[in-house]
From Swiss-Prot:
Protein's UniProt name: RuvB-like 2
EC class name: hydrolase
The enzyme's E.C. designation: 3.6.4.12
Summary of subunit composition and partner proteins: Forms homohexameric rings. Can form a dodecamer with ruvbl1 made of two stacked hexameric rings. Component of the chromatin-remodeling Ino80 complex. Component of some MLL1/MLL complex.
Gene Ontology molecular function terms on file: ATP binding; ATP hydrolysis activity; DNA helicase activity
Protein task: Has double-stranded DNA-stimulated ATPase activity. Has ATP-dependent DNA helicase (5' to 3') activity suggesting a role in nuclear processes such as recombination and transcription. Represses gene activation mediated by beta-catenin. Proposed core component of the chromatin remodeling Ino80 complex which exhibits DNA- and nucleosome-activated ATPase activity and catalyzes ATP-dependent nucleosome sliding. Involved in the endoplasmic reticulum (ER)-associated degradation (ERAD) pathway where it negatively regulates expression of ER stress response genes.
Annotated source species: Danio rerio (Zebrafish)
Knockout mutant characteristics: Fishes display embryonic cardiac hyperplasia with increased cell number and size by 72 hours post-fertilization. Gut and gut-derived organs are incapable of growth and differentiation after this time. The mutation enhances ATPase activity, rendering it DNA-independent and causes aggregation of the protein into large complexes.
Family: Belongs to the RuvB family.
Length: 463
């Protein structure tokens, strides 16, 4: 009788790779300044705009100090001169602790809530509260876990947990909930854990170095830590950083914390905000909390109307106000909601409160360097001739159009099994995709063939 050999099918293990989308400003890492706030020509993804970046560096230092709130900055310049890039550079330089909220001018117009409510929520999102509290924790290395289960299978489980430090060892009695928490965290002998006495939360810090030579199958993510020193019970200061908007939402209704995840916050009453402001001020006086004025960035600010600007004038005078950064590419244009014209479409009384940073068009050398950085970001290799042609296109049309041709030319290159984008690839995508000037010329030539053409000089005789 032939022996049957059992074959075990080994499941295929796939690595989960992190997907990072490449955005228009994903190459920006900071403002590219040295310690003396002097801008480098090319640094952290920023190119040129030396005076604008130096001014933004001063604003950045003012934000980091956190002492001055309610200041407003306007970044004004032609399209494609790096206004949003400077704002993103400020955001990257601030770090994770300082709140940064970005929105476009048209985002505040909604049927669900009023314009002033949308602006109020944006302001509150950009103000952080650092709350300090002291908690008692038990920190030690697990020596042994004993769990006694009832013989009948029903009833409460009880057990004992032995913890030790370098100086002492103690046995704790365990209840049902603590046993479930230990099982959930998969705590075993040799683990270094912390237990929050107030909440009963168990956190596993890692494995003890004394167990490093054990013959256990451990994954690459296993961390080895020293056995804790001193007493088992310690007092630890925990710092929580939340925004004022999150506190507003949680206190606005029952089960308000669920609205933080769903995004359905709705309009929040002013009485709730006043109570929260009073409570936060009380915490500040007691030393329990610290206010972190963040940054609110409003792009395309000319889209706001006269009512929004009136609200901003009042909101900037509050002591709980972030640093407001705005950007616009408009010249002298009509203020939305009125028949009056003003520089950048912003009322004069609002302009009087602003520090204005001007951006200038990029030179050919700077355009070439920006395109080189974008090619590295999008993982596209260009030949020297193709780089020169693309730079000329960027100078004659716009920088955004030239950047958009990089990925399309890279795709054309891959389709022909090439490794480096050549001039022919640039020419092909240039002929396929029109820029603004060629599109306008095309419309002028064939305007009579399009429906609802409003530029026709002759009217049809309907008599």
């Amino acid at each position: 009788m032939a022996a049957q050999v059992a074959t075990t099918k080994v499941p295929e293990v796939r690595d989960i790779t992190r997907i990072e989308r490449i955005g228009a400003h994903s190459h920006i890492r900071g403002l590219g300044l040295d310690d003396a706030l002097e801008p480098r020509q090319v640094s952290q993804g920023m190119v040129g705009q030396l005076a604008s970046r130096r001014a933004a560096g001063l604003i950045l230092e003012m934000i980091k100090d956190g002492q001055i709130a309610g200041r407003a900055v306007l970044i004004a310049g032609q399209p494609g001169t790096g206004k949003t890039a400077i704002a993103m550079g400020i955001a990257q330089s601030l770090g994770p602790d300082t709140p940064f909220t970005a929105l476009a001018g048209s985002e505040i117009f909604s049927l669900e809530m009023s314009k002033t409510e949308a602006l109020s929520q944006a302001f509150r999102k950009a103000i952080g509260v650092r709350i300090k509290e002291e908690t008692e924790i038990i920190e030690g290395e697990v020596v042994e876990i004993q769990i006694d289960r009832p013989a009948t299978g029903t009833g409460a489980k009880v057990g004992k947990l032995t913890l030790k430090t370098t100086e002492m060892e103690t046995i704790y009695d365990l209840g049902t909930k603590m046993i479930e928490s230990l099982s959930k965290e998969r705590v075993q002998a040799g683990d270094v854990i912390t237990i929050d006495k107030a909440t009963g939360k168990i956190s596993k810090l890692g494995r003890s170095f004394t167990r490093a030579r054990d013959y256990d199958a451990m994954g690459a993510q296993t961390q080895f830590v020293q056995c804790p020193e001193g007493e088992l019970q310690k007092r630890k200061e925990v710092v929580h950083t939340v925004s004022l908007h999150e506190i507003d939402v949680i206190n606005s209704r029952t089960q308000g914390f669920l609205a933080l995840f769903s995004g359905d916050t709705g309009e929040i009453k002013s009485e709730v905000r006043e109570q929260i402001n009073a409570k936060v001020s009380e915490w500040r006086e007691e030393g329990k909390a610290e206010i972190i004025p963040g940054v609110l960035f409003i792009d395309e600010v000319h889209m706001l109307d006269i009512e929004c600007f009136s609200f901003l004038n009042r909101a900037l005078e509050s002591d709980l106000s972030p640093v407001l950064i705005m950007a616009t590419n408009r010249g002298i244009t009509r203020i939305r909601g009125t028949n009056y014209q003003s520089p950048h479409g912003i009322p004069i009384d609002m302009l009087d409160r602003l520090l204005i940073i001007a951006t200038t068009p990029y030179t050919e050398k700077e355009t070439r360097q920006i395109l080189k950085i974008r090619c590295e970001e999008e993982d596209v290799e260009l030949s020297e001739e193709a780089h020169t042609v693309l730079t000329r296109i960027g100078q004659e049309t716009s920088l955004r159009y030239a950047i958009q041709l990089i990925s399309t030319a890279g795709l054309v290159c891959r389709k022909r099994r090439g490794t480096e984008v050549q001039v022919e690839d640039i020419k092909r995508v240039y002929s396929l995709f029109l820029d603004e000037a060629r599109s306008s010329q095309y419309m002028k030539e064939y305007q009579d063939s399009f429906l609802f053409n409003e530029t026709q000089t002759s009217q049809m005789d309907t008599s």
